[in-house]
Amino acid sequence: MLTKALILFGLLALAQGYSFTSREVKCHVCKAVVTELEEAIAKEDPHKMADVSGFRLDAQGNSISKKVRLVKSEMFLTELMEKICEKMDDYLKATYKSNGKFTLLKMIINGQMNPDSSLVDFVQDGDLNKSLGHFCNEVLEDNDEIFVKAFQAEELGNDLDIKICSEQASYCDESPVQEEYDFDGKEEL
């Protein structure tokens, strides 16, 4: 009986060591969503076009038709966002062994176990990480227009996760990396 109590106390103490806010979790979920969307879009043919004609008619009664790249169409992006939260089942909450910093770790990358899994301690979660899917749905529901507009941009950029998750949705506190300043082309004062 004493052994069971000590084990239970040890597990509770271990679980108490991992405290992070829902904002931190949403930050990492938001970044994971951006990554998953980027990967899903990269798999599509960038030249495939979609007809986005509405129910508008011109003066002669013909429907007005407009074609856009499929990966930039609102319909495609919305459908993709509706499915993307299922990917959160592939992630686990973890903390880095080196600094105790919270992260979400995707378990399988390119059909292989994530090599970073040896660098982290996995967080035992009472809900078996099902909250990640709920956080994903919440992030997308609250920011669906932000995601669509960002992914419709002609150039996505390298720091799209920071632009969406930090600058617009305000889940993270990161800022984009500044461009390097060219000292060679400038005169001294």
Curated annotation (Swiss-Prot):
Keyword Cell inner membrane among UniProt keywords: no
Q: Where in the cell is it found?
A: Endoplasmic reticulum
Motif, Prevents secretion from ER: chain positions = 186-189
Give me the disulphide-bonded residues: 27-172, 30-165, 85-136
Saposin B-type domain location is 23-176
Sorted alphabetically, the Gene Ontology cellular component annotations on this record are: endomembrane system; endoplasmic reticulum
Reply yes or no: does the keyword Cell membrane apply: no
- Any one GO MF annotation of this record: protein-folding chaperone binding
Knockout consequence? Formation of embryos with altered dorsal-ventral patterning, dramatically decreased levels of ea in the perivitelline space and reduced processing of ea.
Database matches in Pfam families: DUF3456
- Top-rank taxon of the source lineage equals Eukaryota
**According to the UniProt entry, where is the signal peptide?**
1-17
A Gene Ontology biological process noted in the UniProt record is: polarity specification of dorsal/ventral axis
Q: Which UniProt keywords apply?
A: Developmental protein, Disulfide bond, Endoplasmic reticulum, Signal
**Role, per record:** Involved in embryonic dorsal-ventral patterning which is generated by a series of serine protease processing events where gd processes snk which cleaves ea which then processes spz into the activating ligand for the Toll receptor. Required during this process for the secretion of ea from the developing embryo into the perivitelline space and for ea processing.
In the record, the note on similarity to other proteins reads: Belongs to the canopy family.
| Name of the protein in question | Protein seele
What organism does the UniProt record list as the source? Drosophila melanogaster (Fruit fly)
